[in-house]
């Protein structure tokens, strides 16, 4: 994303990969153009929001015609740096970490886990999903140019490991632990607590109907 585009709202930026994934599917099916209404129905984002999101990037479509799928796909590929590979490291090869290694973002052409770390001796020196697993004690020896890390470790260990990652130059952390991490302001962390998300879903099912939320 270029310097000017980095000024777009964070909520818009988070939706761009969603648009890109749908456009890839449209392109694969041979569809040549799409309306904001069709996009809205597919990605479950209202049409007005989609048009506003796209407006931050200039004129991407034509009134009465919609959007050219090939053009949008090419535009968002460049915007999201899809032609540039990003190597990601993973800390914690437990059940969740192992699942990530086997999946390894196979649908994303520009992102892959290149190495993993753990303290379990039975896993150190092995490969999981084709990804080498190293001793966490040797973290500083292996991490060089990587800037993104996935954290799937016990909460009690999360902060100390995060401190080491920051010292190594990691700029972004996808945190799957319950811990809320303290980092410098220039570090970006996305917290994903699966237990909290599940509890929230159950609560909303019990206390709110979908129609109430729409209203």
UniProtKB/Swiss-Prot annotation:
Annotated source species: Bacillus subtilis (strain 168)
Subcellular location: Cytoplasm
Name under which the protein is recorded: Redox-sensing transcriptional repressor Rex
UniProt DNA-binding region: 18-57
Subunit structure: Homodimer.
GO biological process, one term: negative regulation of DNA-templated transcription
Keyword Isomerase: no
NCBIfam families from the UniProt entry: PRK05472.1-3, PRK05472.1-5, PRK05472.2-3, PRK05472.2-4, PRK05472.2-5
